[in-house]
Amino acid sequence: RAQVRVIRYDGTEAKVGTEMNVVKDEIFIGPILKLTNDVLAFVKTQIKEHTYLGSDGRFRTDEQYPEFCWTELCVNSICHRDYSILGTDIQVKLFDDHITVESPGILPGLVRPYNIREMHFSRNPKIALYMRSYKLVKEFGEGVDRMFREMAEAGLPAPEYRQNEFMVYATIRQAKDAAGQVAGNGDVNGDVNGDVNGDVNGDVNGQLNGQLNGQLNDNS
C-alpha cells in the first residue's frame, strides 16, 4: 500500500510512555505522485533553518540538511520499498539532530550498505519509470552518490544505511561539536565573526593606546 507516516520528535531520540516526545504525527495516503509531493511538502516544513551573517556582510539562510539529500531519502523509500510486505509503512522520523527513513524490505538485488553508492537496482521498475516521467527520479543510479557528496560539501557526516530482516534504515545527521552538541551554521559563523571582531577590536585598541601614549610622552 502507498502510505507514508511522518513523525517529528522533540529531542534526539524517540521516547515512550509518560516521556513520549512526538510533536507531529501525520499519515499520507494516496496515488504515488500525490503521495510523494505531499510528503515532500510536509517534510520541508519540518526542516529547521539557520540564519547567519556571511563573510560578505550579508545574511544567509541555510537548511539543516541539503534539500536534495532528504528529498532523495523520501523519494527512494516510496520508489523502492517492498510493497509485498503488509502491516507496516514507510516512516520518516525527524529528530533535532538527524532524520531516519524506514522503508519495508531489504535492499534489492545485489545492493548492500557497503556498495550502495555504486550499485543500482530498481525493485519496482514500473513505479520508477512512472516517477521518472514526473522528474522525481532519474534512474541513473547516481542519486545516493550525489547525496554523499552534498553532505560532505555541507560539512555534515556521511549518510548511514543499515538493514535487518525486513526493513532498511537510511539516516542523515547534523554535525556535532567537541562537546557533543549539534553545531549549526550559526555556531561556525559565530566563531568566525568572533575572530574578526577580536582582530578589529585589537587593531582599534592598539591604535588608541599608541595615540594616547604618544600624547602622554609629548606632554612630559
Predicted regions span which residues?
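C-terminal regulatory or interaction extensions
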Residues: 1-220
